[in-house]
């Protein structure tokens, strides 16, 4: 089936079956014969329609003879009318009597008087015609646009074939050799004849030989590029000369319509203007040729024809775009298909649909989770056809017309019928932007008065909806299959868990949380305190009777016979829960986190139905008690801490001290800045803590005895914040504590904090300082929303064809998971990371070596619990990264479907879910940056390591010297300190910073909380390893260092500055008394090079002891961290861009030594134990992070900055790169408190690593440097080995997501993504086949997607259902047995 057939499919059953059986679509270059074959006649005139009769002109652009009749079954002159003459061709006007819709599919053509080059093959870089003829673009354009001649046959002259010569050169050659001595050509004709002469078979052999013979890499690259195009032509049966056209197609007139407007004017498609231009110029050229006009005039006309055709195909690609009457560039054929408004994205991937409507949403607190309120008026419009058919069926209306009238009159019976039609008919609700799949869910409609859609409050978080004027769209699924999918898959009750991380997304929030928190708080001396009850029901009765108060602490015997200490409110909540949830889950104050845990437990243990019922009950009770509590905000709730004044004064004194030190020259400006910011951060934190302390507890007095007791506060703001209903400590601090430090738009923190709170009011200066942060937030929001949406689009495109395709791929490879530690503390335990994954190898008990779990076990909550109990510290799991499936991923490598809680089904679109999970929070976070209001959210710098466990110290690769105070100073950065327990298991591990003081020794037994090492967080010291005398070298004032005198202090510091000349190398050596440089560890001279910004702490010639500090370098000034920095970082990683601050990476393991400098760059040498040393050049001003004599592993960073991903891949391999990418991206999201499962990132990284670069093609058909799909590479190599040829070798390759999307095997998917013309040009040249395996391609050709319920193996499966006997309805019995599980659903 050709593309042509696809787009001319009529609605007959045979054709629809045809489209279903469509196997693939191929795109090739159209030959002139093809174009003539498509055509129904030649368009000879530029006329469109007759201005008097409005009928199309004959042989014009709208000619009825060529394209078909304007009116159904009526010829142009009116001789034949109606169906009876069908198929007759009118002898008078030549029009076939047929349906007018053929004007949508019949094409015409224009025979060109001179050949014309196709602009796509000429201008798409690299130019296809240019590469094939081995000509530069400039030369080719000169020839095509009649600027220069090209030699076709040099004859007896000294010119070479295909040499480009100007008019003057040509005249000189003719003068010299005579006119017949050579043949030259100009324009597309010449290019066409050169293309015709090419013998591609010979050219292929010749290029292959040249490529093997040459040593030059650039030449090899050039030859390979040319060879690729030659091979493409040979394999696709395209002919090179077809890139130059002698006939062009004219698209059907209905696709470029001419529409009459009121007032006798016409609106026309731009294409008509472009076609008219071509026809006019073509006709003029024909006439000039017939008249035998001078050569120069004909040449000019040919050039104009070439330009007109260029504009038709791609206006504006070359030269200035042709504009219409209003100065707007005309829309060419290329513009029709590319971009957001093009055919692909506007009409094929996104369509407007019937049976839909939109309205404002309001909250529906009385709804059940599976319901939504649908306005009656809206329902009437949406369900009209159903109502018509029902009216007819009941005999209330005889025809559809009368039914229509009844509905328009809104008769009473219509509303009754509407009720019935709508009952249990699922409808879909969608809120834009639909960032993840929970943005469309289905509900059962309840008809409501008014015009607003009512939405259940618990689904708001999934939609990210609020009721400040948001609108939502309603869609009605029509077919039975669609309704079943809505009910079974999309119903809100089936979407309780988030696909991004598997935690519940249907979780009570705001008022409900506040109500539940209020219910479960306890309070001293309440009515009925210390009463004992025999069962929970008795508590409820006592409460209803007013015997006990809601917050009273009481004793209750539970069903298992145990007596528990609890409160009345908690028992009331317990009554709502499914019985399998333990009482301990509610015997606590219910905050938002606890409620989420409760819902999650209920889902895992009691199932979906019980959870849905629980959520609805929690919602009702929460609202009721929030109303009863009457929690509200008043100004006096904002209590300003009494100690605030003192804290601020203390901080101010510290800052004054720091300023004084700065004035005395003891510290530099950067240090001062860092310290001041730190003091204020700490002060703000202290004020905040004081405020929370004061606001968080109340003193309650017993009215009878007068006894007093501190209780959890009932302050409204505190309750809202603590419960997680609204607001956080940060906002409370700004309201009642102090606003704290603010950030400038550049991200720097302003040193002066705002010491007032909103309650006290801000001064003018403070208000002005605040505006910085606020405005930055607003600007960021606007910019980043677009950025984030674009990131999501790229992510979706790269993984859109990743589907779960089989159960087990049989891989023996996987990845190792361990705890994620930060500074020695476990940040994310192994059990959390392994949850929902499948074990690759069996897991054994670390102590007894007993088998705990066999391979291929899914790690669920129970398995994870055992891993924690047995203290398993590492497991090997299966991962998407190591899955061997040829297409998609297998079930076992993916693991659990996070949104459903069971192992993933075959056919699940895990790729798109991964893209949505990563993209969605990006948008959310960018929209939320300004919530912190730019208040500097900066953590206080860490300056020591503290033991988290008792144990024994083990030091590795630690070099330390003892200073004059007897303390050990750590040298270098490769030293590590670990703590092991009695069993020899490593409990924590720290990398010791350079210059830190080590406070423990090897093998020392330590206790928990002991300080292990400490350091100056603001400065990095350079510590001497040996005693001796200081000798400066290249430390020259004004050249390499500057004495910076502080105006205020009159003190000077010597700071190393950027030095212009290359031969300076400031360093400090330590010499003996004879002036010889001493040696330190590893036999390296004791010379310390000083980076830019280092501050010298010693004088030339001074005596020095080991462990003394020679110089210090202030650490970087801190900027506020914000996802705004994070989003570009995520995009940078996914796009594999070169980081701005690129680090130098060591490719081998070995010892680092400094080796002087060359060409203005510093040289580092890494010497391995065996093998050759490797040199690295580090640019000036880049800070080297390793010290002389350090040991580095392959892939370790030698300088500060981020490593380039290609370097990581080369030095450490795919697995490490995948882990690095996952960790770096998670870092950004985790910082913002967003949980995304690792597997989503892995799915995307898998797509980035799906290709390899061929190093040696061996006996295969690959080319050197070609990028090949891993699957394809494996298949080809297996085939080659089977036939006794040498297999190819390749190295892994990492592609950015845009690149990976554009190099996908489906050209339809790639074309609809970006660079449409380029993708289509390449694909047509290669005669590419698209096998329609992804989702996008199938949507574009109008089929069901091959995933989910449309997964091909499901669609082609017949299911036999055995007959079942009808069973009597047991509903009432069930109800009696267990009233909790049977509900009014």
Swiss-Prot record:
Q: Which UniProt keywords apply?
A: DNA-directed RNA polymerase, Magnesium, Metal-binding, Nucleotidyltransferase, Transcription, Transferase, Zinc
Residues at which Mg(2+) binds: 466, 468, 470
Say if the entry is tagged with keyword Transferase. yes
The top EC class is transferase
Task: Provide the E.C. number(s) assigned to this enzyme.
Answer: 2.7.7.6
A biological-process GO annotation: DNA-templated transcription
Cofactor binding, per record = Binds 1 Mg(2+) ion per subunit.
Catalytic activity of the protein: RNA(n) + a ribonucleoside 5'-triphosphate = RNA(n+1) + diphosphate
SUPFAM superfamilies, sorted: beta and beta-prime subunits of DNA dependent RNA-polymerase (SSF64484)
Q: Which cofactor does it need?
A: Mg(2+); Zn(2+)
Binding-site residues for Zn(2+) 2, renumbered to this chain = 809, 883, 890, 893
Which residues does Zn(2+) 1 bind?
75, 77, 90, 93
Q: Name one GO molecular function term.
A: zinc ion binding
What does the entry list under GO cellular component? DNA-directed RNA polymerase complex
Keyword Nucleotidyltransferase in annotation: yes
Q: Sum up the protein's function in the record's words.
A: DNA-dependent RNA polymerase catalyzes the transcription of DNA into RNA using the four ribonucleoside triphosphates as substrates.
Q: Which family does it belong to?
A: Belongs to the RNA polymerase beta' chain family.
Q: How does it assemble?
A: The RNAP catalytic core consists of 2 alpha, 1 beta, 1 beta' and 1 omega subunit. When a sigma factor is associated with the core the holoenzyme is formed, which can initiate transcription.
**Name of the featured protein:** DNA-directed RNA polymerase subunit beta'
| Organism this protein belongs to | Nitratidesulfovibrio vulgaris (strain ATCC 29579 / DSM 644 / CCUG 34227 / NCIMB 8303 / VKM B-1760 / Hildenborough) (Desulfovibrio vulgaris)
């Amino acid at each position: 089936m050709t593309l042509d057939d696809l787009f001319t499919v009529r609605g007959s059953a045979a054709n629809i079956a045809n489209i279903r059986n469509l196997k693939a679509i191929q795109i090739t270059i159209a030959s002139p014969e093809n174009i003539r074959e498509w055509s129904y006649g030649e368009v000879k005139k530029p006329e469109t329609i007759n201005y008097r009769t409005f009928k199309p002109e004959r042989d014009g652009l709208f000619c009825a003879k060529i394209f078909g009749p304007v009116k159904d079954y009526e010829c142009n002159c009116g001789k034949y009318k109606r169906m009876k003459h069908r198929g007759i061709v009118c002898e008078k006007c030549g029009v076939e009597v047929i349906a007018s819709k053929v004007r949508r599919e019949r094409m015409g053509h224009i025979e060109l008087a001179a050949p014309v080059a196709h602009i796509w093959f000429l201008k798409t870089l690299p130019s296809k015609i240019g590469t094939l003829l081995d000509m530069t673009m400039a030369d080719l354009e000169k020839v095509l646009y009649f600027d220069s001649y090209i030699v076709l046959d040099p004859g007896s002259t000294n010119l070479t074939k295909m040499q480009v010569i100007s008019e003057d050169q040509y005249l000189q050659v003719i003068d010299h050799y005579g006119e017949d001595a050579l043949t030259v050509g100009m324009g597309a004709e010449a290019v066409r004849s050169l293309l015709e002469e090419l013998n591609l078979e010979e050219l292929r052999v010749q290029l292959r030989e040249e490529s093997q013979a040459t040593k030059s890499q650039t030449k090899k690259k050039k030859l390979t590029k040319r060879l690729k195009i030659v091979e493409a032509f040979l394999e696709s049966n395209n002919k090179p000369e077809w890139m130059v056209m002698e006939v062009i197609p004219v698209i059907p007139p209905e696709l470029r319509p001419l529409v009459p407007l009121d007032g006798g004017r016409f609106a026309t498609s731009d294409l008509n203007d472009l076609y008219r231009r071509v026809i006019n110029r073509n006709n003029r050229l024909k006439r000039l040729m017939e008249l035998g006009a001078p050569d120069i005039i004909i040449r000019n006309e040919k050039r104009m024809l070439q330009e007109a055709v260029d504009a038709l195909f791609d206006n504006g690609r070359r030269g200035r775009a042709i504009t219409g009457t209003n100065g707007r560039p005309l829309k060419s054929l290329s513009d029709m298909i590319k971009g957001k408004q093009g055919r692909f994205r506007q009409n094929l991937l996104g369509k407007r649909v019937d049976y839909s409507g939109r309205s404002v949403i309001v909250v529906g607190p009385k709804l059940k989770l599976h319901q939504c309120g649908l306005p009656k008026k809206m329902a009437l419009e949406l369900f009209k056809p159903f109502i018509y058919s029902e009216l007819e069926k009941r005999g209330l209306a005889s025809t559809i017309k009368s039914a229509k009238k009844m509905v328009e009159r809104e008769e009473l019976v219509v509303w009754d019928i509407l009720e019935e039609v709508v009952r249990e008919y699922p409808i879909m609700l969608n809120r834009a932007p639909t960032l993840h799949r929970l943005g469309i869910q289905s509900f059962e409609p309840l008809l409501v008065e008014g015009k607003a859609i009512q939405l259940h409050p618990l689904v708001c978080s999934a939609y990210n909806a609020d009721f400040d004027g948001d609108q939502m769209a309603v869609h009605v699924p029509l077919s039975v299959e669609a309704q079943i999918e809505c009910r079974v898959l999309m119903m809100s009750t089936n979407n309780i868990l988030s696909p991004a991380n598997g935690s519940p997304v249907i979780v009570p929030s705001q008022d409900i949380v506040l109500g539940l928190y209020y219910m479960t708080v306890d309070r001293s001396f309440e009515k009925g305190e210390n009463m004992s009850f025999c069962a929970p029901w008795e508590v409820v009765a006592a409460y209803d009777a007013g015997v006990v108060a809601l917050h009273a602490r009481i004793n209750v015997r539970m069903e298992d016979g145990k007596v528990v200490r609890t409160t009345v409110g908690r028992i009331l909540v317990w009554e709502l829960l499914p019985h399998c949830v333990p009482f301990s889950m509610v015997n606590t104050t219910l905050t938002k986190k606890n409620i989420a845990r409760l819902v999650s437990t209920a889902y895992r243990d009691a199932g979906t139905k019980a959870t849905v019922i629980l959520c609805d009950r929690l919602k009702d009770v929460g609202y009721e008690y929030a109303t009863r509590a009457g929690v509200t905000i008043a100004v006096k709730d904002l209590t300003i801490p009494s100690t605030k004044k003192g804290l601020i004064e203390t901080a101010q004194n510290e800052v004054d001290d720091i300023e004084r030190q700065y004035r005395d020259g003891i510290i530099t400006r950067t240090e001062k800045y860092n310290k001041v910011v730190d003091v204020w951060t700490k002060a703000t934190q202290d004020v905040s803590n004081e405020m929370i302390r004061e606001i968080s507890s109340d003193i309650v007095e017993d009215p009878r005895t007068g006894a007093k007791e501190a209780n959890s506060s009932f302050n409204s703001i505190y309750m809202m914040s603590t419960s997680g209903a609204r607001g956080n400590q940060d906002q409370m601090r700004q309201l009642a504590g102090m606003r704290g430090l603010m950030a400038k738009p550049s991200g720097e923190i302003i040193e002066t904090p705002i010491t007032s709170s909103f309650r006290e009011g801000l001064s003018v200066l403070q208000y002005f300082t605040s505006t910085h942060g606020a405005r930055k937030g607003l600007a960021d929001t606007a910019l980043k929303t677009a950025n984030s949406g674009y990131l999501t689009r790229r992510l979706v495109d790269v993984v859109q064809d990743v589907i779960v395709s089989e159960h087990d791929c049989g891989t023996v490879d996987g990845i190792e998971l361990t705890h994620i530690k930060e500074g020695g503390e476990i940040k994310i335990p192994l059990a959390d990371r392994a949850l929902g994954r499948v074990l690759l190898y069996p897991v054994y008990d670390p102590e007894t070596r007993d088998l705990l779990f066999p391979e291929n076990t899914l790690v669920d909550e129970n398995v994870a619990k055992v891993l924690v109990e047995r203290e398993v510290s590492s497991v090997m799991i299966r991962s998407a990264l190591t899955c061997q499936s040829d297409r998609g991923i297998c079930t076992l490598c993916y693991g659990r479907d996070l949104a459903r809680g069971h192992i993933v089904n075959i056919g699940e679109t895990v790729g798109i879910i991964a893209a949505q999970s990563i993209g969605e929070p990006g948008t959310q976070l960018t929209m939320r940056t300004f919530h912190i209001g730019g208040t500097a959210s900066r953590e206080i710098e860490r300056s020591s390591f503290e033991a988290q466990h008792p144990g024994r110290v083990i030091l590795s690769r630690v070099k330390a010297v003892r200073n004059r105070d007897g303390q050990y100073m750590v040298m270098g950065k490769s030293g590590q300190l670990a703590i092991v327990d009695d069993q020899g298991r490593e409990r924590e591990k720290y990398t010791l910073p350079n210059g830190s003081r080590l406070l423990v020794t090897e093998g020392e037994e330590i206790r928990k909380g002991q300080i292990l090492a400490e350091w100056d967080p603001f400065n990095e010291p350079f510590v001497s390893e040996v005693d001796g005398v200081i000798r400066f070298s290249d430390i020259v004032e004004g050249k390499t260092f500057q004495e910076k005198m502080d105006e205020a202090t009159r003190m000077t510091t010597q700071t190393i500055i950027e030095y212009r000349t290359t031969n300076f190398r400031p360093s400090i050596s330590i010499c003996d008394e004879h002036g010889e440089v001493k040696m330190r560890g590893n036999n390296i001279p004791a010379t310390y090079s000083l980076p830019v910004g280092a501050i010298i702490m010693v004088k030339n010639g001074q005596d020095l002891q080991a462990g003394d500090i020679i110089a210090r370098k202030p650490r970087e000034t801190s900027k506020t961290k914000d996802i705004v920095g994070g989003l570009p970082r995520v995009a940078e990683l996914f796009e594999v861009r070169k980081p701005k601050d690129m680090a130098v990476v060591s490719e081998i393991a070995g010892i680092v030594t400094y080796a002087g400098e060359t060409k203005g760059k510093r040289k580092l040498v890494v010497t391995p134990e065996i093998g050759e040393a490797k040199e690295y050049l580090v640019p000036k001003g880049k800070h080297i992070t390793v010290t002389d004599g350090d040991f580095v592993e392959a892939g370790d960073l030698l300088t500060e900055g981020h490593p380039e991903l290609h370097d990581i891949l080369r030095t450490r391999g795919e697995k490490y790169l995948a882990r690095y990418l996952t960790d770096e991206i998670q870092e950004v999201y985790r910082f913002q408190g967003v949980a995304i499962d690792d597997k989503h990132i892995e799915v995307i990284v898998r797509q980035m690593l799906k290709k390899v670069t061929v190093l040696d093609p061996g006996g295969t058909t690959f080319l050197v440097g070609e990028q090949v799909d891993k699957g394809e590479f494996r298949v080809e190599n297996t085939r080659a080995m089977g036939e006794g040829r040498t297999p190819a070798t390749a190295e892994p390759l990492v592609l950015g997501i845009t690149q990976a999307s554009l190099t996908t095997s489906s050209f339809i998917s790639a074309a609809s993504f970006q660079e449409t013309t380029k993708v289509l040009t390449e694909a047509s040249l290669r005669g590419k086949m698209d096998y329609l395996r992804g989702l996008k391609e199938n949507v574009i050709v109008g089929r069901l997607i091959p995933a989910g319920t449309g997964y091909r193996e499901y669609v082609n499966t017949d299911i036999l259902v055995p007959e079942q006997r009808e069973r009597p309805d047991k509903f009432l019995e069930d109800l009696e047995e267990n009233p909790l599980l049977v509900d009014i659903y």
